[in-house]
């Protein structure tokens, strides 16, 4: 299993950062890696890449303005994502960890670098909304 973690200090107030990250229906507007996201229920949503490739997310824990966790799965991988949000004055520290298991052995050597790239882009997209 590959594990990747990223931490960053976002120049925005905790409630605003939390609200942006959890505004799933508008992911297509601010996430550069997605074409859209579809909310299926209050515990399930699907993200679609620019090429239309779906990944399903199932909420496992939500502690408002503190912690958000979900399981994720597509044809290539299964995993778990944990997001921790901490107020630091007028800024917000984010601490995101992904644990992913590749379903196809050919993909296993590339999972860690792919996760790192995805996390870096996600944080960059969040930052763009607060710079």
Can you describe what each PLM-predicted range is?
Residues 36-40, 89, 114-116:
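Juxtamembrane/interface motifs at transmembrane-helix termini
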Residues 48-95, 99-101, 124, 128-129:
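Hydrophobic-ligand binding "helix-grip"
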Residues 1-38:
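Hydrophobic ligand-binding cavity/cleft-lining segments
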Residues 44-45:
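Ser/Thr-rich, low-complexity intrinsically disordered terminal regions
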Residues 99-131:
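A conserved amphipathic terminal alpha-helix motif
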Residues 19-29, 64, 116, 124, ...:
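Short, intrinsically disordered, mixed-charge
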């Amino acid at each position: 299993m590959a594990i990747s973690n990223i931490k960053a200090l976002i120049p925005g107030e905790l409630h605003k950062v939390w609200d942006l990250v959890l505004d799933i229906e508008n992911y297509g507007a601010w996430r550069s890696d997605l074409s859209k996201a579809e909310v299926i229920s209050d515990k399930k949503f699907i993200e679609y890449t620019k090429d239309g490739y779906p990944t399903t997310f199932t909420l496992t824990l939500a502690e408002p303005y503190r912690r958000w966790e979900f399981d994720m799965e597509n044809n290539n991988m299964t995993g778990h994502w944990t997001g921790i949000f901490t107020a630091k004055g007028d800024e917000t520290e984010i601490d995101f960890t992904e644990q992913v298991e590749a379903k196809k052995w050919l993909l296993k050597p590339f999972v860690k670098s792919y996760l790192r790239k995805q996390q870096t882009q996600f944080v960059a997209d969040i930052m763009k909304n607060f710079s």
